[in-house]
Amino acid sequence: MAKTKNKRKGRKTRRPTKAELEKQRAIKRMVFALFMAFVLFFAIFKLGRVGVTVYNIIRLMVGSLAYPFIFAALIYLFATKWLKKHDGLVGGFVITMLGMLLEWQAYLFSLATMKDQSVIKGTLVIVFSDLSKFRVANFAGGGFLGALLYMPVAFLFSNIGSFLIGGLFLLLGLFLMSPWDVYDVMNFFKDSYAKWQVKRQENREKRFAQKEEARLLAQQAVQEAQESATFDHGLNAAIDLETGEVLDQAQTIDLDDFDGQVHKEPEIIGYQSDPEGEALEAEVPAAEQTSQLPKEEDMSDESLEVDFTPKTTLHYKLPGIDLFAKDKPKNQSKEKRLVRDNIKILEETFTSFGIKANVERAEIGPSVTKYEVKPAVGVRVNRISNLADDLALALAAQDVRIEAPIPGKSLVGIEVPNSEVATVTFRELWEQAKASPDKLLEVPLGKAVNGSVRSFDLAKMPHILVAGSTGSGKSVAVNGIIASILMKARPDQIKFMMIDPKMVELSVYNDIPHLLIPVVTNPRKASKALQKVVDEMENRYELFSHFGVRNIAGYNAKVEEFNRHSETKHIPLPLLVVIVDELADLMMVASKEVEDAIIRLGQKARAAGIHMILATQRPSVDVISGLIKANVPSRIAFAVSSGTDSRTILDENGAEKLLGRGDMLFKPIDENHPVRLQGSFISDDDVERIVSFIKEQAEADYDESFDPGEVSEDDNSNGNGGNSEGDPLFEDAKALVLETQKASASMLQRRLSVGFNRATRLMEELEEAGVIGPAEGTKPRKVLQSN
C-alpha cells in the first residue's frame, strides 16, 4: 500500500496552457453558436412545431420584433470580436430596439380589442394562445419586454406620449449607429435651413411677378373677348378666363358629371318601424277557362260521393287586427353607437389577420345587425369565413354568422347579435305586410334584417317543414301561421286538420268551425287521420278527372260558373291544411304509416288543394328522413344545438348560429339560400281572443268521414303495429320465416321495414303461434313449422 501511494504521489498532472484553454473555449463557443444557429434557422422559417415553438418563445420576450432579435443574435454569435470594436453600433442598436418595442406595444394597446386590458396579462394571453395552438397568427406588440417598458411610460405620458417617446428612441438609436458626428449633423441642418430660406424667398418673388403679369394680361383679354362675344355669340357665351377665347357649349365642363374617387363612410341603416313589406310573390294556379258549361247531371253524379250541400256563411265575420295586443316600440338608438365601434373593430381585426377588407354598409335589424364587407381584389372569401370565432371574440358577441357571399352582391355579410332585441309582434307584422285578400294562404312570416316584412304563400311552397330545438320559437311560429290564415279565410274556404301529440299546443283551437275533426292527440289516431287525408286527396283527383280539370282552382271555377247558370247551388271544395306539431312522436309510434302518408301527400296533394305544415323539435334523420325532405322542399329552421341538425333541416350549416326566441332561417322552394328572419310573437292571450271571436261567429261542424275512429289500448301500446290478432304484418312475418327457415328481429326489421320494438313483438307472436321456438341464448331460434 505504501508503494502504491508513493507512486500516485510521484505522478504529476499536466495543466493545460492558456492557448489550449482558449482553443477549448473557442471550440465550445463554436459548437454552441452552431447549435443556436440551427435552432434559430427553424425559428426563422417556422419549420414544424419546434420552429413555431421557438419562434413563439422569442415572441414572448420581444413580441413581433422576433426577426430583428434573431438576426442580432446570429451576428452576436458569429461576430463577437467585430462587435467589440464597434461599441457605438451596439449601443445604438439596443436603443433602437427599445424604441421599436415601445412603438409596437403602444400600437397594440391602441387597438379597440385591447383597450381596458392589463398590459402584461393581455400581452401574454396573445402569445400563449398561439403557443398552445402551435401557430403564429396574432399581433403580439413588443412582448414581455415591451410591456415592462410601456407600463411606466404610458402611465406618465399616455398612449400617444408612448408613440412620441418611442420615436425619439428610434431617432437617437439610428443616429448612434450612423458614422456621423453631432456637430456635423447640426451644421448640416443649419446649412440646409439657410439654403431653404433663400430659395423660398426667391420662389415667392418669382410667383408674385408671374401672378401680376398674368392678372394684367387676363384683364385685357377678358375685355376684348366680352366685346366680341356680345355681338357674335350672345350674352351667355362661355369664356376661357386664361386665354380669353369663347368656348363652345360642347366644351363647357359640367362639374356634376365629375366622378371623383372619394372615400365614403360606411352607410348605417337603422331598424325601421314601418318599412315597406316585401312579399314572396307566388302564383296560385289560375282557373282553367272553358267555354263549355258543365251539365247539371255531371255536377250531381252520385258515384263520386262528394257532399254538395250548400252551407251558408253569410253571417260570418272575419276577425279584426284589434284583437291582438300592441307592443311599445323599442328604442334602438344605442345600437347605432355600438355599430360604429363594431365597424372599427371589424376593420382592425381584418388588418391584424392580413386581410384587406372594408365595411361598406351596416343594417340594424330587430335581433341582429348585418355588416356588409367588401374584400379587396385577390382576397379569398373563405379567409373571412374562417374568422367567425375570432370575430366573435373581438366583438364580444354571443355568436357570429357569416354569409359568404351575399346572394346577388359582391359582398360578405357578417351578422352580429344586437345588445337589445326588438320584439316583433303579430299585430305589427300584419299591419305592415301587404295583405292580398284573394291569397288565402299568404302568411307574413317575419322581418328581415333590413326591417322589411317577408311573406310566403303556402300554395306556392306547397308544404313546409318547421324544425328547431325546445324554446326556439317553433310553436309560436305555427300559431302565427294559423292566426294569419284565420284572419283571411272563412270556414267554407279553408279547413284544418290539426295533430298535436303533446296535447298542449293546438288544443286551444278545438271547436272552431274551420276544423274537420277535433284536434287529434292520440298518435295511433294521427296515423289513421293522415290516411284519411290521403283518401280525400284520391277522391278529389277522381273528381278532377271526371270534370276534366287539373287542379282545385279549375274545379272551383267550374262550380262558380255552374252556380251562375243554374238554380241548384253547389259549394266549391275548400283548401285543406294539415298541421302536425310534433312529427317525432308520430314517427316513434307508426313511422312507416306516417312516412308513407306524408310522402304521398307531398307528391300529389298540391293540385288537390291540400297542404302540410310539419313541425318537430328533434331534427334527426330518423324523424326527417330523406324521402320526407325530398317531398317537403320548403324549410324553416329555428335555433338548433349543432351543425348536424342544421344540415338535416336546411342541407347546410347556419341554424346552430341562431339566437332563439323567433330567430329563424327561411328557405323557400324558389330560393337557393336561406333568409334570416325575426319571427313574430303571438301570445297565448292573443290566440285565445281570436279563437273566442271565431267560435262566436259559427259553431264547429265536424266531418265524420275524417274521423279516425277509436283505438284500443292494445293498439296504443304497440309501438309500430297492432296486437297479435290485428297486426297486419303478422301473416307476412310468418310467411317470411317459413320461406327462409330463419327467424330474427333484425331480419324482420330489414325485410318488413319496421322498427325494432315491432319486430320484437312479431317474434313473440310467432313464438306464441308455435311458428318458432323459444330463445336459446345467442343461438338462432328454431323454426318449428315448414312451408
UniProtKB/Swiss-Prot annotation:
Disulfide bonds: none
Subcellular location: Cell membrane
GO molecular function, one term: DNA binding
Gene Ontology CC: plasma membrane
FtsK domain mapped to chain residues: 450-647
Membrane association type: Multi-pass membrane protein
Alphabetic keyword roster: ATP-binding, Cell cycle, Cell division, Cell membrane, Chromosome partition, DNA-binding, Membrane, Nucleotide-binding, Transmembrane, Transmembrane helix
Binding site for ATP: G471, S472, G473, K474, S475, V476
PROSITE patterns cross-referenced by the UniProt entry: FTSK
Listed transmembrane segments: 31-53, 57-79, 92-114, 134-156, 161-183
Composition bias type Acidic residues, residue spans: 702-716
Family: Belongs to the FtsK/SpoIIIE/SftA family.
Role played: Essential cell division protein that coordinates cell division and chromosome segregation. The N-terminus is involved in assembly of the cell-division machinery. The C-terminus functions as a DNA motor that moves dsDNA in an ATP-dependent manner towards the difSL recombination site, which is located within the replication terminus region. Required for activation of the XerS recombinase, allowing activation of chromosome unlinking by recombination.
Domain notes: Consists of an N-terminal domain, which is sufficient for the localization to the septal ring and is required for cell division, followed by a linker domain, and a C-terminal domain, which forms the translocation motor involved in chromosome segregation. The C-terminal domain can be further subdivided into alpha, beta and gamma subdomains. The alpha and beta subdomains form the DNA pump, and the gamma subdomain is a regulatory subdomain.
Protein name: DNA translocase FtsK
Species per Swiss-Prot/TrEMBL record: Streptococcus mutans serotype c (strain ATCC 700610 / UA159)
Annotated gene: ftsK
